[in-house]
Regions:
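Mixed-charge, Lys/Arg-rich low-complexity intrinsically disordered regions
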Residues: 1-14
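Compositionally biased non-globular segments, especially hydrophobic aliphatic-rich helices
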Residues: 12, 35, 72-75
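Short, surface-exposed secondary-structure boundary micro-motifs
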Residues: 14, 18-21
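Basic/aromatic-rich interaction segments and small domains that mediate binding to polyanionic partners
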Residues: 22-58
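Intrinsically disordered, low-complexity, charged/polar segments
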Residues: 44-83
Length: 83
């Protein structure tokens, strides 16, 4: 199973779920089953698993390290001076 950008997905990864409803969420990937890149597993958003955790569609998720790398590439990883 792989995220939108092709990175291998593993349970326990910290992810950005871009297509969560009603808004994107950051959480931990849980209960995903290898071999499926679509609606597979959940984005755990609290300290414990919940029935309200959004479904994680791998093609709509990114590993948080990749999101941080994109921000750094665009110069958005640091606060502007004077703020």
């Amino acid at each position: 199973m792989h995220y939108r950008n092709g990175r291998e997905a593993k349970n326990g990864d910290r992810i950005l779920n871009i297509d969560a409803y009603p808004a994107p969420v950051i959480g931990i990937l849980r209960d995903a089953v290898p071999g499926n890149d679509y609606c597979n597993g959940y984005t755990q958003i609290g300290p414990e698993p919940s029935q309200n955790d959004p479904i994680a569609c791998m093609c709509d998720c990114l590993h948080i390290d990749d999101v941080l790398a994109i921000l750094a590439e665009k110069g958005l990883d640091k606060r502007p001076e004077g703020m």
